[in-house]
Amino acid sequence: MQRRNTRTVQVGSIAIGSAHPIAVQSMLCAAPGDINANIEQARALKTAGCDIIRLAIPSMEDVRLISAIKEAVDIPLVADIQFDYRLAIAAAQAGVDKVRINPGNIGSADQVNAVVETCREREIPIRIGVNSGSLEKEILQKYGRPTAEALVESAMGHIRLLEERHFTNYLVAIKSSDAITTVEANRLFAQKTDCPLHLGVTEAGTAHMGIIKSSAAIGGLLCEGIGDTIRVSLTADPIQEVLAAHDLLAALGMESDRIRFVSCPTCGRCRVDLFRIAEEAEQALSGIHKNIKVAIMGCAVNGPGEAADADLGVAGGNGELLLFAKGKPLYKVAPEKVTQALLEEIDKL
């Protein structure tokens, strides 16, 4: 699909924009004062495939976390700053790779100037973060609620604060807890500027509902070519955010080094425990980086017939499964040996 044309913003070693792969982000959730826990979580996120990590900096004491993580983990860091412009300056001076602020609530004009100049000197981009829970009072009064138009007006106002200072090294995130509002706001904003967009649904919910809402909003926008970096926000282990984001990109054909895993919902023709077989196989294959399609099908109707385009798959029979490749039968395998058989055949591809 054709992506919306944007300029490039460099965040540490990761380039964000339409000329580059979509970057996956997450956020540390350990207490800022627990440096070891944050380092451990940052390492785990990088191993899971996270490209950029955001961390909250609620106090001056917490600024030390930036250098501690950068010494231990080679990954771009984004400082999440609220209200106190001095924290943004301190984070930039500490070597953070991007600063997330709302220029409209960071302080006076002089304080905004100080943040912008510090970021300009160090070539650090600013991420303007607008969400439905923190709109300016005057905008809420104008629209009555956080509509898509209200969110975009807020974002454009923040942009003006930066561009009036001739600062264009920024990107924008516009998020709502409502999936439709998120889609409408980003679609509207994308028509107005060429700056890169960070996509996400704020307060999306637990792993189950959060993934559904995020997939609807983020996936819908990506299908329209909108979006340059994403976060699947979840009330869950941040590792799940990263895995879900990569699975979403793979499902849309935007990542070519991941297994595309498909399985049928089963029916009365199925004579094997396909639920267990599919879960076990998916988990075992999730870390393999190969551009192939693997199908776990319940009977001969769905596979290898309907799944003939799969590079590899199994179709359930009477207490056993037929392993096939590109629609051609290979051999039969017992249910408890399906995962191992798939792993062995994948190694041959």
PLM regions with names:
Residues 1-27, 120, 283:
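N-terminal amphipathic alpha-helix/helix-capping segment at the start of soluble metabolic enzymes
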Residues 19-37, 56, 75-83, 139-152, ...:
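Active-site mouth loops of central-metabolism enzymes
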Residues 22-28, 53-55, 77-81, 99-101, ...:
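Hydrophobic faces of well-ordered beta-strands that scaffold small-molecule active sites
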Residues 29, 35, 46-69, 100-108, ...:
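Glycine-rich, proline-tolerant flexible connector loops at the mouths of alpha/beta enzymes
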Residues 60-81, 114-126, 186-197, 281-283:
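Alpha-helix-loop-beta-strand connector modules within alpha/beta enzyme cores
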Residues 72-75, 93-99, 120-123, 190-196, ...:
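Glycine-enriched alpha-helix->loop->beta-strand junction motifs that scaffold or abut catalytic
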Residues 86-127:
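Hydrophobic or amphipathic alpha-helical targeting/insertion segments
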Residues 130-131, 139-286:
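Catalytic alpha/beta core domains of metabolic enzymes, predominantly
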